[in-house]
Structures are given as structure tokens and as C-alpha cells.
């Protein structure tokens, strides 16, 4: 297993949305994931220090004809946890995010997430992005656990309803 850290840079509106899938990531990954509120005027100092130290990349979509990114040497991934519209704004208004290495993932198919309007055609929700990232870094067991939780989240008849997250053992496998 490859040891990875996920930082969810979260827009303030996401903290109260029942449709936010970042909470699933925090629940399944435990100490391997953190959530930091995004603030336009005060970048998170600790995150800036980690970016400066290296091994950090922003997971952010590129053009559809870009090859999948090489993850060699990366152990810490930043994901903007917000709507696609807000994610673009956050990226544009955060010079430190524009300077960090940017990677894009090539998902095997379309997003299964349909709980929000105005979704980007080729975009993934936060949980789906982390699932693909975990798979790409060899963390298959944790990816499967997160996928199971995500599928239960989007199909309430087969598990907890939207916004209902049952506690689980949070450990990377």
C-alpha cells in the first residue's frame, strides 16, 4: 500500500450541504484525510509549508486529450471540495494553487453522482475523485471501501440516506 494524504480544501458552503461527498472521504480515510476551509484572503499556512516541502499536487481537471498524470514522487493530494463553478473561482483566486503541480485523472467512465444540478459533463464528485486517486496509488482496499460508502450514499434505499453517514473504522488499507 502506498501511503497518501488527502487535503480537502473546502468552500464554506459545502460544510452544511447534505449532498457533500467530502464527508465520506473523511470518514473512510480517517487520519489520512483532512478538511481545511478555503479562505480567499488567508491561505492555510500549514498547507503552504507542505507545498513548499514538495510531494504535493492539486488534483484538478485538465483537457480531455491530456494523458493521465504521473503520480511518481507524490504522497499528498489537494482536492478542491466544492461545486465545479466554485472550484474554478477558488483555483483562480488562490495563487498558491496555481503554482503547485497539477495532476488530472482519467476516470473509467462518467460520474455516478447526480445529486446536484449543473454538474460538469466530464467531472467527478469529491468522493469519486478520491476513489480514482486511491486506485491510481495502489490503495485498492480503501478505494473499494470508499466506493461502497459512496454507492450507499447516492442510493439511499440500499444504505444510509443522503447526508446520513454511519461511523466506520477509519483506517487506510
Which ranges hold each PLM region?
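Cys/His-rich short segments
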Residues: 1-3
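Conserved beta-strand segments of alpha/beta enzyme cores
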Residues: 5, 32-34, 101
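A structural signal for short, well-ordered beta-strand segments and their strand-loop junctions
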Residues: 8, 58, 79, 103-104
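Residue-level signal for short, function-critical loop segments
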Residues: 10-12
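Short N-terminal binding/cap micro-motifs at the start of the first secondary-structure element
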Residues: 15-18
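Active-site phosphate/pyrophosphate- and oxyanion-stabilizing loops and adjacent acidic/basic residues
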Residues: 23
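S-adenosyl-L-methionine/SAH cofactor-binding core of RNA-modifying enzymes
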Residues: 27-92, 96
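C-terminal folded domains that constitute the principal catalytic or ligand-binding module
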Residues: 76, 85, 89, 93-173
Amino acid at each position: 500500500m502506498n501511503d497518501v494524504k488527502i487535503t480537502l480544501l473546502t468552500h464554506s458552503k459545502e460544510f452544511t450541504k447534505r449532498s457533500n461527498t467530502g464527508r465520506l472521504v473523511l470518514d473512510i480515510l480517517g487520519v489520512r484525510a483532512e478538511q481545511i476551509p478555503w479562505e480567499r484572503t488567508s491561505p492555510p499556512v500549514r498547507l503552504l509549508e507542505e507545498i513548499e516541502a514538495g510531494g504535493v499536487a492539486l488534483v484538478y481537471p485538465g483537457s480531455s486529450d491530456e494523458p493521465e498524470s504521473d503520480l511518481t514522487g507524490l504522497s499528498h493530494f489537494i482536492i478542491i471540495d466544492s461545486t465545479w463553478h466554485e472550484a474554478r473561482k477558488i483555483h483562480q483566486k488562490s495563487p498558491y494553487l496555481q503554482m503547485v503541480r497539477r495532476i488530472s485523472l482519467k476516470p473509467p467512465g462518467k460520474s455516478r453522482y447526480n445529486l446536484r444540478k449543473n454538474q460538469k459533463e466530464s467531472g467527478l464528485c469529491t468522493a469519486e475523485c478520491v476513489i480514482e486517486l486511491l486506485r491510481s496509488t495502489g490503495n485498492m482496499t480503501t478505494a473499494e471501501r470508499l466506493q461502497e460508502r459512496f454507492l450507499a450514499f447516492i442510493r439511499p434505499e440500499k444504505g444510509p440516506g443522503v447526508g446520513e453517514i454511519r461511523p466506520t473504522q477509519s483506517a487506510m488499507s
